[in-house]
A protein has these predicted regions:
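ATP-dependent small-molecule kinase catalytic core of the GHMP/sugar-kinase superfamily
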Residues: 119-204
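Generic beta-strand or strand-like secondary-structure segments
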Residues: 64-71, 106-114, 125, 129-132
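A general structural signal for well-ordered alpha-helical segments in protein cores
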Residues: 62-69, 104, 173, 184
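Short, charged, solvent-exposed linker or helix-capping segments at domain edges/interfaces
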Residues: 46-49, 97, 184-189
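ATP-binding N-lobe of GHMP and related small-molecule kinases
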Residues: 1-95, 113-119
């Protein structure tokens, strides 16, 4: 398999997940977008980041977008190349808007665009690779499919599925973005291991 294009660009939305009772399953795409472009090269990989995360995110092979691109190319047996990547980030990092899922989906989608074959790396494969890297599909699915999604993942078989829902017209999300960062792992660690039956029922 070869790469058909040497310059591609994608944009991926922010997402909000863990909606209502849908912990690790329900997510919503938002009208806030990261844009990423890639030139395939024979040289070393370089990453330029503008906006959110500039000066803080990795700028070489350890960059999350690059890692997702590499994994996707490996998965379909496509050749690895050097990349010159430019990221315009508008999604705040570590503030609950799915920045890591958006970066992963951007990387896999860039791989698909470089390959240039509509039959390779379809949306289901993007969902699978993204969920594998992210650990759960709740932010990945709305970043891939748009709208609202209900998703699930079998941890034993790694099978991933998602159903897309169209939100009612006239509903506009409002995001309250804190002025501090909180990593997902730390936020999850603050949650109790179990929830009382009454609380779970009330949340539904």
């Amino acid at each position: 398999m070869r790469l058909r294009d040497d310059f591609v660009a994608v944009k991926v939305p922010a997402t909000s997940a863990n909606l209502g009772p849908g912990f690790d399953s329900m997510g919503l795409a938002l009208d806030l977008w990261d844009e990423v472009s890639v030139h395939a090269t024979t040289g070393a990989t370089s990453v330029v980041v503008e906006g959110e995360g500039a000066g803080n995110v990795e700028q070489g092979e350890d960059n999350l977008v690059v890692r997702a691109l590499r994994l996707a190319l490996d998965r379909v047996g496509a050749p690895q190349v050097g990349v010159r990547m430019h990221c315009t980030n508008r999604i705040p990092h570590s503030r609950g808007l799915g920045s890591s899922a958006s970066a992963i989906v951007a990387g896999v989608t860039l791989a698909r665009a470089l390959i240039g074959d509509a039959d390779v790396l379809g949306r289901q494969e993007i969902l699978e690779i993204g969920s594998q890297m992210e650990g759960h599909p709740d932010n990945v699915a709305p970043a891939v499919f748009g709208g609202a999604t209900v998703s699930w993942m079998n941890e034993e078989s790694s099978e991933v599925g998602s159903v897309r829902l169209t939100p009612p017209e006239g509903i506009s999300p409002v995001a309250f973005i804190p002025d501090f960062e909180l990593r997902t792992a730390a936020a999850r660690a603050a949650l109790p291991a179990t929830v009382p039956h009454g609380d779970a029922s009330f949340n539904v």
